[in-house]
């Protein structure tokens, strides 16, 4: 008996690890509104709350942790404040505070955010100006933070 092939069957697949990717809707640059010096009233005062979100697309259920790294001013350590690194016409005594669910982000430290199922996971954040010294001057404010996501 002779056997003749009737059809060829190509099978392809992909094996991947569980994880998430940052959605294109996540902003890379956050612009705070202009603020007047009289909006501040002493060390620790804030203004210019600007909500934004890190949006993740997850391919399966995962536990997500976030680490935000950035330079903290000596006068505001432990308050989630990033140092003002503007190079031209820099405002003095002002930094940028990051909040997650209205609480200061602990910089340079990993925090567990919770579990995400497959699909979209949104991390609500806020950036705002934060007075770091009693004497402040007007000028530009620029801060940089690097975030790293870990998932299990």
Residue map of PLM features:
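Mature extracellular/passenger domains of Gram-negative fimbrial/pilin and adhesin proteins
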Residues: 1-152
């Amino acid at each position: 008996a002779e056997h003749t092939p009737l059809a060829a069957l190509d099978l392809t697949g992909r094996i991947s690890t569980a994880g998430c990717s940052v959605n294109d809707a996540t902003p890379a640059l956050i612009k705070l509104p202009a603020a007047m010096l009289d909006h501040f009233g002493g060390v620790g005062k804030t203004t210019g709350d600007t909500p934004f979100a890190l949006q993740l697309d997850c391919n399966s259920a995962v536990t997500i942790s976030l680490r935000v790294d950035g330079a903290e001013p000596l006068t505001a350590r432990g308050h989630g404040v990033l140092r003002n690194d503007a190079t031209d016409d820099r405002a003095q005594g002002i930094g940028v505070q990051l909040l997650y669910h209205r609480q200061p982000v602990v910089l340079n430290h990993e925090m567990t955010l919770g579990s995400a199922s497959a699909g979209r996971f949104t991390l609500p954040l806020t950036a705002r100006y934060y007075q770091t010294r009693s004497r402040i001057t007007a000028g530009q404010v620029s801060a940089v933070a690097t975030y790293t996501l870990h998932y299990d």
